[in-house]
Amino acid sequence: MRKGSVKEVLAKIKYDPRENEEDYFIIIEHRGSYGNVRKIPVSLIELGHGYFFVGETQIPYHRILKVVRKDGRVVWESRKRGLK
């Protein structure tokens, strides 16, 4: 877990032909959602420089709390305080 930046991990998932982006989702900090988090399939995001996009919504990478496989294995997790 946690090898490289979240952007590097997402780029590998999206662009490495050995990976299937349909097998992954991200959990982001999203105020107003249940538990203040939101789950987004990696297949729905586009990577940018300091942000990623879900449709036309721009979201900073620092909002990502976890990158998780469908089987529940966490492949990247934020070092934010208090994250369980």
From Swiss-Prot:
InterPro entries named among the record's database cross-references:
MJ1316, UPF0248
Quote any Pfam family the record assigns.
MJ1316
What family is reported?
Answer: Belongs to the UPF0248 family.
Q: What is this protein called?
A: UPF0248 protein PF1300
Organism field: Pyrococcus furiosus (strain ATCC 43587 / DSM 3638 / JCM 8422 / Vc1)
Source taxonomy: Archaea, Methanobacteriati, Methanobacteriota, Thermococci, Thermococcales
